[in-house]
Swiss-Prot record:
Complex and partners: Part of the 50S ribosomal subunit.
PROSITE patterns given in the database record: RIBOSOMAL_L6_1
GO term, biological process aspect, one: cytoplasmic translation
GO cellular component terms, semicolon-separated: cytosolic large ribosomal subunit
Natural source organism: Mycoplasma genitalium (strain ATCC 33530 / DSM 19775 / NCTC 10195 / G37)
Keywords of the record: Ribonucleoprotein, Ribosomal protein, RNA-binding, rRNA-binding
Sequence similarity: Belongs to the universal ribosomal protein uL6 family.
Function: This protein binds to the 23S rRNA, and is important in its secondary structure. It is located near the subunit interface in the base of the L7/L12 stalk, and near the tRNA binding site of the peptidyltransferase center.
Coiled coil: none
SUPFAM superfamilies in the cross-refs: Ribosomal protein L6 (SSF56053)
Organism taxonomic ancestry: Bacteria, Bacillati, Mycoplasmatota, Mycoplasmoidales, Mycoplasmoidaceae
Cell membrane listed as a keyword: no
Designated gene of the protein: rplF
Name under which the protein is recorded: Large ribosomal subunit protein uL6
Gene3D superfamilies: Ribosomal protein L6, alpha-beta domain
């Protein structure tokens, strides 16, 4: 049996509702609605009992065990997303590194000769504080992480000076540069 698949997911029935069709699982909550696509002939059942959701499997095939844990994690992330939401913070470290939001675009100045414009997905909200702190929030964990990674890829942190786009509380292991010793 799958350890992750056997975990029960706690919900507040007054806030969260679950609807299942043959191809979609829809979870509604106070922050919005998350849908999970289900493969055809999925041998799993999603049962709501009191204040928990249980994902149960019908057989002991290897593929079913794999899907059991995966879909339990996906449903758990969807429930957390529609109740609390997800958030990632990025920090710009470097001389002249700035960010601002203009309409649907996030403008970044990261030391290149041109500003970088990233289109903000509809399901996300992006806030910029102090021109160097970017907060990305939304109800889909995957989308929040993906957009944060897209921003970070423009200037990954480098180990010598520590400049770049960092996740909040990320520790960059610094390297010592070459030192010029006296010539003999």
């Amino acid at each position: 049996m799958s350890k992750i698949g056997n975990r029960s997911i706690k919900i507040d029935p007054s806030k969260v509702s679950l609807m299942q069709t043959t191809t979609l699982l829809t979870i509604k909550g106070p922050l919005g609605e998350n849908t999970i696509k289900l493969p055809k002939n999925l041998p799993l059942k999603f049962v709501v009992e009191n204040d928990t959701i249980k994902v149960t499997n019908n057989n002991n095939l290897k593929q079913t065990k794999i899907l059991h844990g995966t879909f339990n994690a996906l449903v758990n992330n969807a429930v957390i997303g529609v109740t609390k939401g997800f958030e990632k913070k990025l920090i710009l470290v470097g001389v002249g590194y700035r960010a601002n939001v203009e309409g649907q675009f996030l403008n970044l100045q990261l030391g290149y000769s041109h500003p970088i414009k990233e289109l903000i997905p509809n399901q996300l909200t992006v806030k910029v504080e102090k021109n160097t702190e970017i907060t990305i929030s939304g109800i889909k964990k995957e989308l929040v992480g993906q957009f944060a990674t897209e921003i970070r890829k423009w200037r990954k942190p480098e180990p010598y000076k520590g400049k770049g786009v960092l996740y909040f509380n990320e520790v960059i292991v610094r390297k010592q540069g070459k030192t010029a010793e006296g010539k003999k």
